[in-house]
């Protein structure tokens, strides 16, 4: 988005040529034979990396070198859809056509061998590449080989850092970098991460970049106060130590702040979209301005150089969708470079050159300085005193949930494709493919997609892409399940279970429920299906009857809630169980509809409880009043209810309004949606629920299942009323007496936990001008408060903004509807199709000791992100996979993974090749009671049941370099020398994972015959 505050070896090529042109493939499937792919990785040794830097231009010693970086920033959707941007459609909205930019840039690079250009968004570049002739592809390969066309970052998109989950970040980066590796070999491998537009930067993002093999990271947006301090202290560039668990330098990443965001210096923009004056060097012309521009440039360069530590500085020469007429840019830059460098003969100490981020980084590394170290992150981001970009943490909550559900579904799709092999892609249901959903999910990670900061029609298009990806994966799942089950049924994927709609379960007297568990450990999962009224019998995979309930729910004013069938499914690791459901001919409700509980001051307190938890509700208000952990004998008063902030439309202090990006409430104290809730109670052997109705547009169900150690709070909000002309930003708030000393804790992209302190920044003295918005942080999976003894943790089902604005309090923003744009470029208020959106979601609440809490929230968050997938079938289908007995239960693992180990990725990579990632999901010292923070060792040789691993190669996180061949630039820090890394060894029978470590493997496999 463009609103920025002013302020190859021959052998490798042979493999590529043998494979033919790169084609769109399924599930990261390469066009290269495995042997060629491994050869490419082996050729990518440290010498190849040095060779990449050796293509950098010559610099001048002892004077200021100004590295001009021509670039374009091409949003993968924002004001226009992805296709509209690529083809240049709807230029009345925004003049932008990516295909013309790339055409023009290649032509301009060929005109002068000194010119350089960087490109970032592989979602666009790959599409352009597929439209080129073989001759043009060779031209581009030559430019890449020469280092004149350089890829920075290399992900499918430039992902957001606040609303993204680390698994989806890794997937989208893998997709983009895989394309570059397949297409250009090591020549096209980016050496620098480049996040010039995301609105704040997470520590986990930097850790992931380091583990991907990047040498450095440059970004554009930095809090205005932080930037001022850094410029004064000469800390615009430093080393980011991005993990408290991984041993340095594993997660160390050299990080630089760009001086002008990602724009050119003022008055030096020579794009067709700009109005700055071109360089006129003919002194006879009345428009002659060369001397003035040269003097101006020298002053700008000298001033910038005062804030950086070496005799090298960088200037970004480009911006949003620029270089559609690249000649206009390059012609003026050619003149500027020649004229400025000519001044050296007159004593100037400034040298200007075409460069790239990697070449600039190379010079910084050669300076051999000692750099300061950063340990925290760059949230929240503000570009002015009342302009905190913390609203987008919660914008478009329905899209955020759809993205998270799609990540869940994609992993199920990838796993079954890997477990079954080609039979999942071509089978009785047709051609199944994981690639469309993989690419759609990659697009959704863009910093104007999952962030909720695009225009409405673009958000609709993002959802369309996800839906199309689901269809293709559903075919794949159907083929895989037919192969594994031995049945060909008409499978039904009930996509609207969140609103209790599933036609098959609501109409059929008999049906089957297949529940697939994507986790590497057994799970007990409560299945909830809408049904007709009656009595149902549920049988497990062995034909034994299991307890079940039909719960009849109260009807709200707006819609009827169908009865729901509940039963607990026992699911094997990385596998499925099949349950059969039959309606009993006689009608007898298993639970009567709950009646409203009147509010009387003398009424006893209402409780729901199981063997682990008791939740107590105030009889006068209907609000949650108290939670008790009965195992630990912990009792905590907890008052939970909903409030809303009145969104600012500007005031006397500032005309800044709340919008898609900005959160700015009119006052610090939010208003209650209601001071009490009408409540209804549901109690059956399988579930206890308190239904709370706060208003016509806000309700909640507090739910407790047998055996569970957490409360489930299922909230429903919307459409938010704005008839009073007040925009509203709705929060769920938990108030407790815990003495938290201004501290609370949030996750970073779903992985490590960061401490937050109210009205505080770790690296500068904060002038807090927005006490609410300035204390909001992104919450991807969890937030908690603790007094050191007790800990209250709330897990989310999507990314949200959250905070603790007073001791003992915790809040999460669940929905927003705004009447005014925040003037950051969208030019559209966040109204969600005008009528507003109704959104449903879940918060999972845990109360435990501070010492034991991590074991609970880590494993629960894993299960929330990768929840079981429910598929229905009418039953009685034809036999499939003749020769093998029918199967009602299956596990893809021969043994469960330990609880501290998460199977992050199992996906098809190529013919007889799989991509495997294993992760230690606990941090150092996080759990001592069960020793879950200790290193853990696995044997991969016979771990999987459907295939045998014949060869195992360990790679970097994104699988574009062999780990043994990968090397990164080394940096000296003021914290002293980093430990010497132990020599690399790989033994498939002894794979050890250290806390927070992710290990990535390419496995050559042979699939086994699927039998009983």
From Swiss-Prot:
GO terms for cellular component: lysosome. Zn(2+) binds at residues 73, 75, 197, 447. CDD domains: GH38N_AMII_LAM_like (cd10810). Its EC number is 3.2.1.24. Its main location: other. GO terms for biological process: mannose metabolic process. Disulfide bonds join 56-359, 269-274, 413-473, 494-502. It is an enzyme of class 3 (hydrolase). InterPro entries: Gal_mutarotase_sf_dom, GH38_C, Glyco_hydro/deAcase_b/a-brl, Glyco_hydro_38_C, Glyco_hydro_38_cen, Glyco_hydro_38_cen_sf, Glyco_hydro_38_N, Glyco_hydro_38_N_sf. It is found in: Lysosome. Residues 1-50 form the signal peptide. One of its GO terms (molecular function) is carbohydrate binding. It comes from the Eukaryota. Glycans are attached at residues 368, 498, 646, 652, 693, 767, 833, 931, 990. Its cofactor is Zn(2+). SUPFAM superfamilies: Families 57/38 glycoside transferase middle domain, Galactose mutarotase-like, Glycoside hydrolase/deacetylase. The keyword Ion transport does not apply. The active site is at residue 197. Keywords: Disulfide bond, Glycoprotein, Glycosidase, Hydrolase, Lysosome, Metal-binding, Signal, Zinc. Binds 1 zinc ion per subunit. Belongs to the glycosyl hydrolase 38 family. Necessary for the catabolism of N-linked carbohydrates released during glycoprotein turnover. This is Lysosomal alpha-mannosidase. It comes from Macaca fascicularis. The gene is MAN2B1.
